[in-house]
Swiss-Prot record:
Protein name in UniProt: Interleukin-2 receptor subunit alpha
CDD domains per record: CCP (cd00033)
Cytoplasmic side, ranges: 260-272
Record gene name: IL2RA
Entry-linked InterPro entries: IL-2_rcpt_alpha, Sushi/SCR/CCP_sf, Sushi_SCR_CCP_dom
Length: 272
């Protein structure tokens, strides 16, 4: 075998895992009467540039936004732009419907609150800014190590039996999301788990879908600490695996060298 190819394979094998962003194969798990939200997005996360009905992405525009950066600063690359699907009516002024106006105001309010609550994390991007004529639902492509948090929708209360978050992990070469331990029950229904009910802060005056996504500043600090702890643990485990692999290779090389030396000694004795 070519020694250069052997050296390349060896270096590839002992490279510490996690240096390259691995996309998660599936979406985060779904919980009945609950929605999930990412407080910050790891580098490598992609967001589809989706437009609402009657609009389409411009031909020269990128199909997605990408969270990229370095150890000191991360931001979203590319910009999503939507244009009217009807080329003939481009000069016609379209009056937005009341629902669209309400949705736009809600999105702007949500973006402002998120920018105020969020703290910059190394290797993470904030919530992507909204763009004109954006689709109602955002489609993300998360990477390994991403953490999302769950919250019951308006009209339901949370019964916690464990962590209410999910993390995308790499296990045996495959990605999987941990299962969040959250149960949402109607506010009028009796609790089946005494002592496990936890109150939820839901600002009045916001639609159900938007209210369920908001995260308070206090919750964000706690979640940030949990996220940092989990990421440190994941990195430490992967690093230990890499070190163990290096030690194994070193021992193998030493054993092979020893066996080769013994064979040479035996041949020399026979020759003598």
């Amino acid at each position: 075998m070519d020694p250069y190819l052997l050296m390349w394979g060896l270096l590839t094998f002992i490279t510490v895992p996690g240096c390259q962003a691995e996309l998660c194969d599936d979406d985060p798990p779904k919980i009945t009467h609950a929605t999930f939200k990412a407080v910050a997005y790891k580098e490598g996360t992609m967001l589809n540039c989706e437009c609402k009905r009657g609009f389409r992405r411009i031909k020269s525009g990128s199909p997605y936004m990408l969270c990229t950066g370095n150890s000191s600063h991360s931001s979203w690359d590319n910009q999503c732009q939507c244009t009217s699907s009807a080329a003939r009516n481009t000069t016609k002024q379209v009056t937005p419907q009341p629902e669209e106006q309400k949705e736009r105001k809600t999105t702007e309010m949500q973006s402002q609150m998120q920018l105020a609550d969020q703290v910059s994390l190394p290797g993470h991007c904030r919530e992507p800014p909204p763009w004109e004529n954006e689709a109602t639902e955002r489609i993300y492509h998360f990477v390994v190590g991403q953490m999302v948090y769950y919250q019951c929708v308006q009209g339901y209360r949370a019964l916690h039996r464990g962590p209410a978050e999910s993390i995308c992990k790499m296990t045996h070469g495959k990605t999987r999301w941990t299962q969040p331990q959250l149960i949402c029950t109607g506010e009028t229904e009796p609790s089946q788990f005494p002592g496990e009910e936890e109150p939820q802060a839901s600002p009045d005056g916001l639609p159900e879908s938007e209210t369920s996504r908001l995260v308070t500043t206090t919750d964000f600090r706690i979640q940030t600490e949990v996220a940092a702890t989990m990421e440190t643990f994941i990195f430490t485990t992967e690093y230990q695996v890499a070190v163990a692999g290096c030690v194994f290779l070193l021992i193998s090389v030493l054993l092979l060298s020893g066996l080769t030396w013994q064979r040479r000694q035996r041949k020399n004795r026979r020759t003598i």
